[in-house]
Amino acid sequence: MKFLALAALFASTVSSIAVDGLIPGARVIPANDVVALKKVGAHHQKHPHRRTVIIRPSFNDEDDVSADFLWGIKWANRGGRLLLQKGKKYVIGKKLDLTFLKDIEVQLDGELKFTNDVPYWQANNFYYDFQKSISFWRWGGEDIKIFGSGVLNGNGQRWYNEFAGQEILDPNNKYYRPILFVTENATRVSVEGITQLNSPCWTNFFVRTKDISFNNVFIHAYSTNASALPKNTDGFDTLNVDGLTVTNTRVDIGDDCLSPKPNTTNVFVQNLWCNGTHGTSMGSIGQYPGVLDIIENVWIENVTLLNGENGARLKAWAGPNVGYGRINNVTYKNIHVENTDNPIVLDQCYFNINATQCAAYPSRVNFTNIVFENIYGTSSGKHGKVVADLTCSPNAVCSGIRLKNIHLTSPAGSPPVIVCDGIQGDIGVECQSSTNLTTKRSIGLARNLKYKA
């Protein structure tokens, strides 16, 4: 295998160290010479001059540089930076366990692209029991910073084509698709500036992670095949996470824009733009029998949601074999929706369960202290005049639900209808029960809608 030396530009201006042993041809630039790189990007605030590691790029889409990448990560670990250069592509074709990290930067200015070798990835991955999730790699440790102007490419089109017509939550589903970016047992992770493109499944999944932030990130999933949509490509999913911050981020994908899942606390979201999504969703939780799930202390502010199924949504499972828990202390503030089927929805009849089954086996997840403030814009009219559907289970508690300054309209006509069933106390606005004859036509198919994961 041939390895590239440093580009002539760097060779002429930067003294570098040839590293014997693992990866011939790679270079490590000492910390005192990093300043010579000048315009390659911003420096870590705490350590402005870091040793920088450069690895060779791929020659083509079949040239797997997984070993080079792992080598570079190890050399950059504990105080260094791995630089993935602008205009270069780095193909990853092997699963990577990166859970040993401490004080590392990865400057992604080029493109990191995964292979679409479906048989390999379905046999070689990191598996999570929660909703049968798999990943290409996993990042863990502490003080991890990923930044730059480059692209993390999941190369998802083949996965979209082959998964068409299937459902992720079908118990018989065996076609597992990798998640693009996973953290596990990680503390203080920062991601900034990059683009995440065409994940085969969820885009981000954070597991047993504390203090993770995303800023100025663009998440995009699109399909070139109109009959094979980029399904389940959620922007952000969490499991056992304390401290998630998402700011100044754009999401254009085929599922939840944001979806904190079981045992997630202390979430802050500000300046988020979502197009074509299933909304900013709390959950789903309560899926697994006998398991306690919690989502608590969430603040979501200044969000635009366009052309989607949902706006601000809470979702909990119902049925004969489900879990229990609570979603508590959640605020949605300054939320702008346009052409959205369900601008505000509390859904305690999730997933694929009709009204009769939900009444027989209601949810055991409590919704408490939920505030929707300054929610404005238009619904799609899919559910008639209904612009908010707040439906709680008789088995669960729904209290402290407050709506303030709601300015939503429907193309189906006026006045807009807010439906509330099973809510304890005053919600702050006029609402009607779904059993009221005057609202039944407005509600339309809302009660029987089968939401996707």
Swiss-Prot record:
**Compartment(s):** Secreted
Per its record, what are the GO molecular function terms? Answer: galacturan 1,4-alpha-galacturonidase activity; polygalacturonase activity
Reaction(s) catalysed by this chain, per the record, are: [(1->4)-alpha-D-galacturonosyl](n) + H2O = alpha-D-galacturonate + [(1->4)-alpha-D-galacturonosyl](n-1)
Output the Pfam families linked to this UniProt entry: Glyco_hydro_28 (PF00295)
Q: What class of enzyme is it?
A: hydrolase
Going by the UniProt record, its keywords in alphabetical order are: Cell wall biogenesis/degradation, Disulfide bond, Glycoprotein, Glycosidase, Hydrolase, Repeat, Secreted, Signal
Write down the EC number: 3.2.1.67
Which family, according to UniProt? Answer: Belongs to the glycosyl hydrolase 28 family.
From the Swiss-Prot or TrEMBL record, give the protein name.
Answer: Probable exopolygalacturonase B
Q: Which organism is it from?
A: Neosartorya fischeri (strain ATCC 1020 / DSM 3700 / CBS 544.65 / FGSC A1164 / JCM 1740 / NRRL 181 / WB 181)
